[in-house]
Amino acid sequence: MTTRTVSPRDLKNLLHDGAEIALLDVREEGQFGEGHLLFATPLPYSKLETSITPLVPRKSARIVLCDDGDGVAQKAAARLNAIGYSDVSVLAGGNAAWAAAGYAIFKGVNVPSKLFGELVEHVYGTPHITVTQLAEMKKANEDFVIVD
């Protein structure tokens, strides 16, 4: 079976069309942290078969796999097809092609939740204190609650 590919531009459109999509990065965890698409979920190829079902329980779900353009995503697509997933595509050229098309690559892990927290802080002006202020509050036995 030939692996379907999607261009970076097509993937960008898929991510914004409102339909269900699972964007899975099949590189190993360290590689994922070095740079990935914003809403990609890490699913290392080494854990593919043991971890796919909790992430994508419906075998007809639309799945796009990304990698470093080194063929790992194609191997993962073939394996997913073999175990019954029917709508699997690969990002043509991997993350490098995504970046070359002018789209952002994000470093680190849990980026969407960190981004959300920063947006909430910016928009709603959530209160924050410095380490020095916290030490002074503790020294004065002030009653406080810290939410991190």
Mark where each language-model region is.
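Rhodanese-like catalytic fold shared by cysteine-dependent sulfurtransferases
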Residues: 1-22, 26-145
